């Protein structure tokens, strides 16, 4: 299912900097048990920019195998080089992923014509659906609703992860792209309002640490149960805010380490949180009763 409660999963590393496949298996099992609808593998939260292409493909292959059909795996296939994005797409299609999350090419700021050509090339490389990913805070390119309308004409482009936090875009995207075009929030603090406005789910960082609770929030919001959704989101708000006190995925990986789920290992240029933020993260987790819950 490429909608609902989708986790943007971290990529765990050993102290030597290698991918920790044992911890990865633990995380995949956690999300299957919690009812998470899909996992995004090797996206922004998965530190995709510090993995080699070989590692990127290996992690996706492992997730498909570990999931064993229990949960959909959506692979990050974005790059600011179209040829590299196409190569990743071809390899991960062979792995058996359910679809792709394809971020706008970053740094080189292509025109609309360049974007169309880029996404068409990726579409030609697979028979799997693609979800566009708009995160201008990282890419310096805002994929506006009028641009999305043009990209949605590509056959296997079925939706967008909209990470601007601008809930007003939901209605405009629906009007331009139709009700069947999947709209996913990419911003945890505004995801509830995004779904109230007509969105179809969220690709969530917070779901890494509270997968079952995020599933409850999404289920309530999509069902129109505003009272329950508001109550759940109020409980989650301190977590939403804490997870972005530094660049994602620094706080979420530190949180998972304090919970006993993964080791607190990053790849440069990412480093552990500043000491003051380490204390903040621990305090928020303690108040939420999330410290040292490895077997819960």
From Swiss-Prot:
The active site is at residues 133, 161. HAMAP family: DapA. It is found in: Cytoplasm. Homotetramer; dimer of dimers. Pathway: Amino-acid biosynthesis; L-lysine biosynthesis via DAP pathway; (S)-tetrahydrodipicolinate from L-aspartate: step 3/4. Its EC number is 4.3.3.7. GO terms for cellular component: cytosol. This is 4-hydroxy-tetrahydrodipicolinate synthase.
């Amino acid at each position: 299912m490429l909608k609902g409660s989708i986790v943007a999963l971290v990529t765990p590393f050993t102290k030597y900097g290698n991918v920790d496949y044992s911890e990865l298996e633990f995380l995949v099992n956690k999300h299957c048990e919690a009812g998470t609808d899909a996992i995004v593998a090797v996206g922004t939260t998965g530190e995709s920019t510090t993995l080699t292409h070989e590692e990127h493909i290996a992690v996706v292959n492992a997730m498909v195998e570990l999931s064993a059909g229990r949960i959909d795996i959506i692979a990050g296939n974005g790059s600011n080089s179209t040829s590299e994005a196409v190569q990743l797409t071809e390899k991960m299609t062979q792995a058996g992923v359910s679809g792709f999350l394809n971020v706008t090419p970053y740094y080189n700021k292509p025109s609309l014509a360049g974007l169309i050509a880029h996404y068409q090339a990726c579409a030609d490389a697979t028979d799997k659906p693609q979800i566009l990913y708009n995160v201008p805070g990282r890419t310096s390119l805002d994929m506006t609703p009028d641009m999305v309308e043009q990209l949605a004409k590509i056959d296997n482009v079925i939706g967008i992860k909209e990470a601007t936090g601008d809930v007003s875009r939901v209605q405009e995207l629906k009007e331009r792209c139709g009700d069947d075009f999947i709209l996913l929030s990419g911003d945890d603090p505004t995801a509830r309002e995004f779904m109230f406005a007509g969105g179809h789910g969220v690709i969530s960082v917070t779901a890494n640490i509270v997968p079952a609770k995020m599933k409850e929030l999404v289920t309530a919001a999509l069902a129109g149960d505003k009272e329950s959704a508001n109550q759940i989101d109020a409980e989650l708000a301190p977590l939403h805010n804490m997870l972005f006190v530094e660049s994602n995925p620094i706080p979420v990986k530190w949180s998972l380490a304090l919970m006993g789920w993964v080791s607190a290992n990053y790849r440069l240029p990412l480093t552990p949180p500043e000491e003051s933020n380490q204390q903040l993260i621990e305090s928020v987790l303690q108040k939420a009763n999330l410290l040292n819950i490895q077997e819960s």
